[in-house]
């Protein structure tokens, strides 16, 4: 048996509640390398034709999909319909169901796992970037067609997969010579929220750097209790919101009402029938409200960041293209200017 896998089993026995990525870190390897070490035991490598793989998932029916970063875990049930994907990017477009934005150019490896658990065998497909970090995990559920799942695994198994070469993460080049006037001017000239990515790239600034550069009518910092306050307001009012959680390779989006909000110790949790969120509220270091111009008026969001600069999550009011933003959402965001009881 592979010594890495043996080490993993020992750690898992000692710390059964830890995620695989955390156990891999304790071993001193990436999660992708841990999966590679499990080949021949409970894992197989899959062909790296990611567009074909995601399109093939349409045949299996319902799956549970997990996209996460170091501070938030976003889980959504859904099916792989409306998959539009190329060599570098794409999307799975099912608002209020499985809704993904895919940065396939970042993807590097994929594995199928069959993990024994106390509740039976857990089947999953796990996709990783070139740094060995998971970008998307797809789990079979009781509603999944296991015959179609097994056919997919057989079709995509790569018995001759090349060994992984995991690259260290390089920090994005950022400038300290910020042209605040130009950033403010270009921000106000936007007509689509997606133009914001180009603005950041042109000026080589992070999102918080851009927020600090513009006027307070476009971006303002609020208390780090803002997420819990906003979710409480949305739950009480029953208006639909959007919650984005992403990493280098994938962003997963929930659209709907907050049904069950449950803080537990340092975790802020949402438990809906089709959607679950686990977010480490004590790791929120900066909370920003931003307003970006579009052809339908301003779109307002709450953006949350960790101390290392990771964007933990982003929230919007539900909005259909071509319609203005919810007035209720704007009122809820506006209430964040007033300190909460915990602030």
Locations of the language-model features?
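Surface-exposed interaction/gating patches
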Residues: 16-23, 34, 46-49, 63-65, ...
């Amino acid at each position: 048996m592979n010594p890495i896998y043996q080490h993993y089993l020992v750690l898992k026995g000692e710390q059964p509640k830890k995620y695989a990525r955390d156990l891999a870190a304790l071993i001193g390897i990436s999660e992708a390398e841990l999966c590679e070490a499990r080949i021949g035991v409970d894992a197989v490598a899959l062909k790296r034709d990611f567009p074909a793989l995601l399109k093939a998932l349409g045949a299996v029916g319902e799956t549970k999909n997990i996209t996460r970063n170091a501070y938030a875990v976003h889980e959504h049930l859904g099916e792989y319909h409306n998959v539009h994907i190329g060599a570098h990017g794409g999307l799975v477009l099912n608002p209020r169901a499985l809704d993904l934005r895919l940065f396939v150019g970042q993807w590097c490896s994929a594995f199928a796992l069959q993990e024994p658990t106390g509740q039976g065998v857990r089947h999953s497909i796990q996709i990783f970037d070139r740094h060995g970090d998971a970008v998307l995990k797809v789990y079979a559920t009781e509603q999944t067609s296991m015959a179609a799942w097994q056919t997919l695994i057989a079709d995509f198994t790569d018995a001759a997969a090349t060994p992984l070469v995991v690259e260290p993460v390089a920090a994005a080049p950022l400038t300290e010579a910020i042209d605040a006037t130009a950033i403010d001017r270009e921000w106000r000239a936007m007509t689509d929220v997606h133009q914001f990515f180009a603005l950041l790239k042109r000026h080589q600034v992070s999102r918080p750097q851009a927020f600090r550069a513009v006027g307070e009518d476009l971006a303002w910092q609020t208390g780090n209790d803002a997420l819990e306050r906003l979710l409480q307001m949305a739950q009480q009012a029953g208006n639909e919101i959007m919650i984005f959680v992403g990493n280098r390779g994938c962003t997963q989006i929930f659209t709907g009402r907050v049904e069950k909000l449950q803080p537990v110790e340092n975790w802020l949790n949402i438990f809906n029938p089709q959607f679950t969120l686990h977010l480490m509220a004590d790791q929120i270091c900066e909370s920003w409200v931003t307003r970006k111009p579009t052809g339908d008026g301003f779109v307002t969001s709450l953006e949350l960041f960790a101390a290392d600069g990771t964007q933990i999550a982003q929230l919007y009011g539900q909005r259909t293209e071509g319609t203005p933003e919810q007035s209720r959402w704007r009122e809820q965001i506006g209430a964040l200017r007033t300190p909460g009881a915990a602030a």
